[in-house]
Each structure stands twice: as C-alpha cells, then as structure tokens.
Curated annotation (Swiss-Prot):
Enzyme class: transferase
Presence of the UniProt keyword rRNA-binding in the record: no
One Pfam family in the UniProt entry: Thymidylate_kin
Catalytic reactions on record: dTMP + ATP = dTDP + ADP
Gene: tmk
Cellular component per GO, a single term: cytosol
Protein name: Thymidylate kinase
Amino acid sequence: MTRGKLITFEGPDGAGKTTVLERLVPLLQAALGQTIVTTREPGGVAIAEKIRQLILDVSHTTMDDKTELLLYIAARRQHLVEKIMPALEAGHLVLVDRFIDSSVAYQGAGRGLDKQAIQWLNHFATDGVDPDLTLYFDVPSELGLARIAQNTEREVNRLDLEQLDLHQRVRKGYLELALENPQRIVKIDASQDLESVVAAALAAIITHSQA
C-alpha cells in the first residue's frame, strides 16, 4: 500500500489556520477522493490531550521554557505513534494543525531556546518523519492578536497572555523557516479574507498532490 501524505498547518496565533483546515476537508475529499484524517498538536490522542491541558493552563504561569518544550515533544511523540503513523501507513491524507515547526518558532525564536537542540528533539520524537508539505499562514502579529481578542468563542490559553514582542519573534521564526525550506513550506497570506485563504491553501495542496 502506498504511504499517505502528511500535510501540516503552521502559523502564529490568530492566523486562522484551524478554520482553514476545517473548511478544506470537504473540498479536498471532493477533489482528491481520498480518506482524510485531521488532528492537532498538542493533542490528537488522549495522552497528548492531557499534556495539552498542562501546557495551556492559564494558572501555570511559572512553567519553565524548557519544561514547556519537553511537554510539547512528549505530546508529539505519542500523537505520532498512536495516530499519525497508523493513518499514513493506511494510505490516508493526514492534515495536522501544528507540528515540528511550531516548536522551532515558539520555543526557539519565541522563547530563545537553542534551535539545534529543538531540531534534534523533533527528530528524536518523530524518528525523522517530516511533513510532505507545510502550509504556513502568515499574518502580522498585531492583526493576529486583534483577531483573537475579537473571537468570543475561543477559550483563552496561557500563550494568549504573552506580550506582543513574543508573537513578533514567533512570526520572524516562521518566516526564517519558510526561507530555509522552500521545497516543503508554502507561505500563504492569511491577512486576506477567509475565502481567498482557503482557495490558496486548496490550490497548494492540489498542486502538491499532482507533482
């Protein structure tokens, strides 16, 4: 059986990637006629969802940056072996809301932790499984935070409480990753209206599937 494809959705907070992912599922099913599995990080499986609660709990204000990183890595490992790899081995198209690049952008560029150490931990946790395609949804930090503030349905988490400068560093980290990985990462202007962003993401995935 042909191995499925792993497509990751990345971007700073407020970029709208989660909404775009949800909108894409029926469009991709119609276009590709393939089983699609959607999931998220941190989370996706029971153990990883419990780790997610630890990471994002607004009361955990004393969490050390390295502790935060290692919790993300632990959640990633469990998620990979329990959900992502079985779906890929079954030949499915797997869409993941955040993956390895989030750690480099948030804990690396954002928190200032060593990028090489993070990349090593990512490789260790994933056994070298990289995305076949990554869609990076780029949005200015000010706009992203404004969207979060306006979204009354969104539950506030610990990272939402961070200052603007951290979100700006995260965005810079993502932009650097996009420049370093042009064959894998497709940058999408997420400051556009939702329909335009969905159309751009759909086109990128279909183009990749036909390559």
